[in-house]
Every structure is written in C-alpha cells, then in structure tokens.
Amino acid sequence: MTRNLDASAPFRVVFVCTGNICRSPMAEVVFRHLADASGHGARVASSSAGTGDWHVGERGDERTLAALQRRGYDGSRHRARQFTADTFDVNDLVVALDRSHERILRGWARTEEDADKVALLLGFLPNPTTLDVPDPYYAATEMFDDVLGMIEDATRSLFRQLEPALRPGSRTAAFPFGAS
C-alpha cells in the first residue's frame, strides 16, 4: 500500500472491534499516545469503531477506562460508533482486532482498495502467537489489563512500521503491510 503524505492530510488509522467499548478504544488511545509522544500527532490520526451498533454513543466500558487509566492513558472522551462502508473513505488503514472483524470488514469493502486497507492488529507483531485479541467483555477485570498489554505491544509495532513515513521530508508512505 502506498499513499502520499502531506501536512494537510494526516495518515488516518481506525481500529475496529465488536462494540467499540473495549478493545478498539484501547488501541485508539494507545496509538494516539504514541503519535503525540513521538511528535507526529499532527501527521497521524486515530479513531475506532465497532462492527455492531449496540453501544453507539456510549462511553467505553468502565473496565476499559480503568485499565487505560492504570497505565497512564485517558480514554474518557471516547464515545462508541459503528463502522460503515463510508468509514473506508476517510481512513488509510483499517485495523481489525480479531479475524471475525477482519472477515466482516473485507465483506463490507466496496473495492479492492478498501479491502487492501484491512489488517489485523496482532499481525504487526514480528512473531505473533495468535492473530486474535480476545474480547474481555465477559471476563474478569484482570483480563482487561492483559488485553491492554497485547494491544500496547502490537500498536507499538504498528507505529514503528509507520513512523519512518511520518518523519519530516517523507512524502510517501510505502507500507510493508496491507492485506493480511
């Protein structure tokens, strides 16, 4: 995947899970933190969405917000939204949190270009032991911390792959990833 970057058009990443109240908000917040901490906050933007509409307009799950806060992140401004086919148009990379989301997103893709934007978050790790970030929604609170750890590792790996294209003077981002 290749995309021209300029100061007026940040590279846009959307993270997608089921209800947009647990996993994808974690990834969005962590990615935004990495972008801001690296000085690239103006050149990259992150958002999140869910494949379902059950929680549209709601805040993140309280256990999600607590896990983020324990690690020094602020997810308090998050409001759940649903991914639609139009979401492909405003994003450069669509990151699925598990293979079921990946299948759904590829099914919603209207073009090959849309489908090529879809990648699995754990696929950015050098040697993933799984490709699915487990859904902590029905699990104990500790699972939220474990899931956040997985998301942090994979999001850091994703950002490391993206970061060279965000440096001043870089006009084109050619990514070693794309369709997974």
Task: Please give the residue ranges for each predicted region.
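Conserved active-site segments centered on acidic
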Residues: 2-90, 163-170, 175-178
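Phosphate-binding/catalytic loops
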Residues: 2-4, 93, 99-180
